[in-house]
Design a protein with these regions (language model features):
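One-carbon transfer enzymes
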Residues: 1-231, 240, 264-280, 286-287, ...
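Short, charged, solvent-exposed linker or helix-capping segments at domain edges/interfaces
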Residues: 143, 255-257, 292
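Short, structured protein-protein interaction patches enriched in aromatics and acidic/basic residues
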Residues: 232-249
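A short, sequence-level motif marking secondary-structure junctions
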Residues: 245-252, 283-289
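A conserved acidic, glycine/proline-rich C-terminal tail/linker
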Residues: 249-268
């Protein structure tokens, strides 16, 4: 079975490496030299050069070159993991068994953008690692493999990413063997897209901490946006922004204090009143610590 692999993030690297180690025939790779779009961008060329895999780099206007490359390689299946662009119909029609996409959510729920960030911010207790046959929609194709992944209260974007990657790589090896045995007759489950939802693109404002939020909401926001992502932030009275990387929920006896009031300073840690309790800011980028009694 001939596979062309498309991807440009850390999961792409782990998946490609696993396919190579398990002896699958990777006849070509399409990737990017650099991406400012993906916080988890990963260079695949150490693998492609080591194993002498023909590689084409995505550029701004080389779609025709990509199509020619794919037709020349004549793959049975294309794996497209960690790619921001929706593939056109012409590419989807090239491989015999279709193009396999990946989405770290429990499809048909939670299609769309930033699935790990939204899942953590919303306080979900579970998500999923889902592979599907791509169509012209966004995350709407027939599902070929789905495994539930538990989200712990202590999980951050980084730890959840790692958990899902470990699960997803095992899934991929299993269904790749199924493809070799069954080809296009591999089991597929059609999505009921009317029953699901789609998450929107996040904006900068979505990462802003407002202490009128609950302690739980602030805690979830910070752990959703911590490394390798952009980080949650505060906007101070002088319009300066401060990145916040880690917070701890704290009980609060200051019921009459307003949200945003600095209740205590302990070393480099800042205790701040929230709507329903308090948050201790543990890791941050304050150039100068606020004073007790100040408002953030």
């Amino acid at each position: 079975m001939k596979i062309v692999f498309i991807g440009t993030v850390d999961f792409s690297y782990q998946a490609l490496k696993a396919l190579i180690i398990n002896g699958f025939d990777i006849v070509g790779v399409i990737t990017k030299k650099k991406s400012d779009f993906n916080a988890d961008f990963c260079d695949l060329t150490p693998l492609t050069e080591k194993y002498h895999i023909p590689t084409l780099f995505r550029k701004k206007d080389n779609e025709e070159e990509i199509i020619s490359f794919l037709k020349e390689k004549n793959p049975d299946v294309i794996y497209c993991f960690g790619w921001s662009q929706i593939l056109p119909a012409e590419i989807l029609s090239i491989p015999k068994f279709g193009v396999v996409g990946f989405h770290p959510a429990e499809l048909p729920n939670n299609r769309g953008r930033h699935p790990l960030i939204w899942a953590i911010f919303l306080g979900l207790k579970r998500t999923a690692s889902t592979f599907f046959i791509m169509d012209e929609g966004a995350d709407t194709g027939d599902i070929i493999s789905q495994e539930i992944v538990t989200i712990e209260e202590s999980d951050t974007a980084a730890t959840l990413y790692k958990k899902i990657t470990e699960v997803a790589v095992k899934q991929m090896i299993y269904f790749s063997k199924e493809f070799e045995l069954k080809g296009e007759n591999i089991k597929k489950i059609k999505q009921d897209i009317t029953a699901g939802n789609s998450w929107r693109k996040r904006g900068k404002i979505d990462g802003q901490i407002d202490f009128r939020m609950s302690s739980e909401a602030i805690y979830n926001l910070v752990r959703a946006l911590t490394h390798p992502y952009i980080g949650a932030h505060l906007v101070l009275s002088d319009e300066k922004e401060v990145k916040i990387w880690k917070v701890i929920k704290k009980s609060c006896t200051f019921a009459n204090s307003e949200p945003g009031k600095v209740l205590d300073i302990e070393g480099n840690k800042i205790l701040v009143k929230t709507y329903n309790g308090a948050i201790q800011i543990v890791e941050h980028e304050f150039l100068e610590l606020p004073k007790k009694g100040q408002y953030l």
